[in-house]
Amino acid sequence: RRVWTRSRGKRGSAPGTLYRHFRTRDALLEAVYRTEVEKLASAGQELALRLSPPEALRSWLLLFVDYIAAKKIIAPALSTLVQCHPKVVEASRTQIHDAIQSLVRRAVESGDIRTDLDPIDLLSAIVGVAHVPAIPDWQQCARRLVDILIAGSRPVK
């Protein structure tokens, strides 16, 4: 905690400023968590506007890998959030599911992805790699897996 408050002070936000806006450390963590989920969810819409459907899906899945990496770093603190604020976690899950379902639906409609693809399977595969303890470079593995998943999701001709 000391390092956290010292590093915030160096960047111009003293602990008093933080606690004026967030009454507790948990409130700050919840705000950060919500913001990260909202950024991930809105990235899906932004990517869909400027990239082809399969490339938008691929790019979003790579952002999802980064999101998981950030969650792993703050996992001990997140356990309190999960226990005390299950509605926050459920709302976040819904936002993430909506984002990937929209991207997959767009890719299916364009004919670039198979019609039998379940978007949650993509997320589950990446989360699974992130939680294998024997993979020290899981992020690189997950990034390679994204390309494998996209290639394997193409329609069979």
Give residue spans per PLM region.
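Helical hydrophobic small-molecule/effector-binding pocket
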Residues: L51-L78, V104, E109-D116, P136-Q139
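Solvent-exposed, amphipathic alpha-helical segments
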Residues: K39, A43-L47, A125, V129-V132
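Alpha-helical structural segments
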Residues: K10, A27-E46, E55, S59-D66, ...
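C-terminal peripheral helix-coil segments that are non-catalytic and often amphipathic
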Residues: T94, D98, S102-D116, G128, ...
